[in-house]
Regions:
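Short, low-complexity disordered leader/linker segments with a strong preference
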Residues: 1-42, 121-126
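Hinge/cleft segment of the Venus flytrap/periplasmic-binding protein
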Residues: 9, 13-14, 24-29, 183-194, ...
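Extracytoplasmic "Venus flytrap"
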Residues: 44-65, 69, 80-92, 101-103, ...
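Short, solvent-exposed amphipathic alpha-helices that sit
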Residues: 54-70, 158-162, 197-216, 231, ...
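Short beta-strand elements in bilobed, periplasmic/extracellular small-molecule ligand-binding domains
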Residues: 68-84, 186-189, 211-229
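Hydrophobic alpha-helical segments within soluble ligand-binding/sensing domains
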Residues: 91, 150-182, 232, 283-286, ...
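Hydrophobic alpha-helical
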Residues: 96, 108-125, 130, 206, ...
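Flexible loop/hinge segments that line or gate small-molecule binding clefts
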Residues: 119-157, 178, 182-183, 283-291, ...
Length: 338
């Protein structure tokens, strides 16, 4: 009797690993079959403002990624892109609409980072993964669910690179920035949104990098231009009148505001380059101004790489091929100088 029990146990010990292996193979086969059956995917894209220059270029790059993927893989990609026009309530309704349309994943450029939980709750209930981009929700919200990711450009790095452009210029020739020779570089600051984390960080660290690099600074004034060229130009018009002949440097949180400052400088009959203007983003218009000698420097986050990461994340989540991906992805950046 004991011999039979021993044989039975021995047989079970031998059989268990085989059964486990069979189960794993069956599970893998089922998953592979499910993936193989996927002949299309639907990606919802929610934009905070479609007329934002950087966002519009990113949108175009996303559309190119989708076309390339369709061509290479024979899988139809539908991009449902909606513009909230700066209204969070509108974006919340748009999220509901895309969920009801059966989107496989939502890529969200959130309007108000402090209330991302509303869209997160809707997506989690429907079990639709989220890829936030460009406008970073608060950390607590990003950590609420394992199917949430963020793609962006490190704001501190952007600012440090921007500041270093000017530190290098000052070290080569102090008079390139200190035009009046008073021993101080007198600057004005054009900021994005007052509540946007990138704006706050860029403002702080561009100035701090200049100070750390030994550039003597004098702040004349600063203001919020909400990332917009026209608002920046209007502020610059006021400052050129109020600080006539004093402004030597314009620090801008993005290229559009830098271009607005340049518009004002030209409109007021000031020679291009006599006031140094620096931006961030490396937009096509910004790089054109750089080539023309109107913009002194910018920091580029290559939008094609940015869009590719958003698309690849979305595709991996849909196809079940995303393995051990970090919750945050920071796009590489580089300084561009006139």
């Amino acid at each position: 009797m004991k011999t039979k029990k021993i044989k039975w146990k021995a047989g079970l010990i031998v059989l268990l690993p085989v059964l486990v292996l069979i189960a794993i193979l069956i599970h893998g086969a089922v998953r592979s079959s499910e993936t193989a059956k996927k002949t299309s995917m639907r990606i919802g894209v929610l934009l905070y403002r479609g007329d934002d220059t950087f966002i519009s270029t990113l949108r175009a790059s996303l559309e190119e990624c989708a076309k390339e993927y369709e061509k290479e893989n024979g899988i139809k990609v539908t991009l449902d892109i909606l513009d909230a026009k700066g209204n969070q309530n509108t974006q919340n309704s748009q999220a509901e609409r895309l969920i009801s349309l059966g989107c496989d994943v939502l890529c969200v450029n959130i309007v108000d980072r402090s209330v991302a939980s509303i869209i997160i709750d809707k997506a989690e209930t429907a079990d639709i993964p989220l890829v936030f981009f460009n406008r970073e929700p608060v950390e607590e919200d990003l950590n609420r669910w394992e199917k949430i990711y963020y793609v962006g450009a490190d704001a501190k790095k952007s600012a440090v690179l921007q500041g270093q452009i000017l530190v290098d210029a000052y070290n080569r020739n102090p008079e390139s920035l200190d035009r009046n020779g008073d021993g101080l570089v007198s600057y004005v600051m054009l900021e994005g949104e007052s509540s946007h984390q990138d704006s706050l960080i860029r403002t702080e660290w561009s100035v701090q990098t200049l100070k750390d690099g030994g550039v003597p600074l004098k702040k004349l004034t600063g203001g919020i231009a909400n990332w917009e060229r026209s608002q920046a130009a209007a502020l610059m018009d006021q400052w050129l009148k109020g600080y006539s002949g004093e402004i030597e440097l314009v620090l801008c949180n993005n290229d559009d505001m830098a271009l607005g400052a340049i518009d004002s400088i030209e409109r007021n009959g000031i020679l291009p380059g006599s006031i140094k203007v620096v931006g961030i983003d490396g937009t096509p218009a910004g790089k054109e101004a750089l080539r023309n000698g109107k913009l002194f420097g910018t920091v580029e986050c290559i939008r094609e790489d940015y869009a590719r990461e958003i698309f690849d994340l979305a595709e991996g989540l849909i196809m079940g091929t995303l393995n051990n991906h970090e919750k945050y992805y920071w796009c590489p950046q580089s300084a561009l100088v006139n």
